Amino acid sequence: MNVLDNSVIIKGSKNGITVFLDEEMPFEELLENVSDKFKNASKFFNNATMAISFDGRNLSAEEEKRILNVISDVSELNIVCVLDENNDIKSVYEEAVKKAMNSFNISHQPERQKITDPKTTCMFYKGTLRSGQVFEADGSVVVLGDVNPGGKVVAKGSVIVLGSLKGNIFAGVDGNENAFVVALEMSPMQIKIGDIIARSSDSGVNKISKGKNKSKILEPKIAYVYDQNIYVEDLEQNALDDISLD
């Protein structure tokens, strides 16, 4: 029993959670213990968004993938990224934001110019914005958490939410329609970019709509202005491939 209890240990950290794994236990048995541990802890974590790291055992890419799939199956955790001991989470996020701020090439709009954000200032907000809370930024902003219904982000630049976006976003407040909004889960009450507004109640396939079937698998999306409308599309790999760092 002690072997089972100690084969998988979950500890919280300032960046998320660290999972300590037994080095000697056969992987298939360890995988079952991971399932049991996260199933028992699912109510504690709820649908939190966080980074995860593994310690105590060297994992192959396939083993790591299987563990993440098990965690997704038995819990509501939204895993933003996997860190190793050499990762600094702020550096990881800053690199991601730097890429996003340079340019996004929308795969389904080849005639559209790349979306660029001239703002060089980027602020970070770590935590959940709850109903009634407002975060304002003079440039662009990255939210390391969720924006709940009634929460609001106001930014002169672009907004990236590394979590669930279910509140209100106002990007490009100075009329900058080149600003954009990215979220790991895009279900906002309202998005405003420049002078263009889209609400969750709007009709039309190109505008924001609430998803009918919530999936635990995150599908990052980007919202941007084109032809005086706000479009929401999947943030696909071929869009990321076109990003260049200056």
Curated annotation (Swiss-Prot):
GO BP annotations listed: cell morphogenesis; division septum assembly; regulation of cell septum assembly
Keyword set includes Lyase: no
Sorted UniProt keywords: Cell cycle, Cell division, Septation
InterPro entries the record matches: CAP/MinC_C (IPR016098), MinC (IPR013033), MinC_C_sf (IPR036145), MinC_N_1 (IPR055219), Septum_form_inhib_MinC_C (IPR005526)
Free-text function comment from the UniProt entry: Cell division inhibitor that blocks the formation of polar Z ring septums. Rapidly oscillates between the poles of the cell to destabilize FtsZ filaments that have formed before they mature into polar Z rings. Prevents FtsZ polymerization.
Record text on subunit structure and interactions: Interacts with MinD and FtsZ.
Assigned protein family: Belongs to the MinC family.
Protein name: Probable septum site-determining protein MinC
Organism annotation: Lachnospira eligens (strain ATCC 27750 / DSM 3376 / VPI C15-48 / C15-B4) (Eubacterium eligens)
Taxonomic lineage of the native organism: Bacteria, Bacillati, Bacillota, Clostridia, Lachnospirales
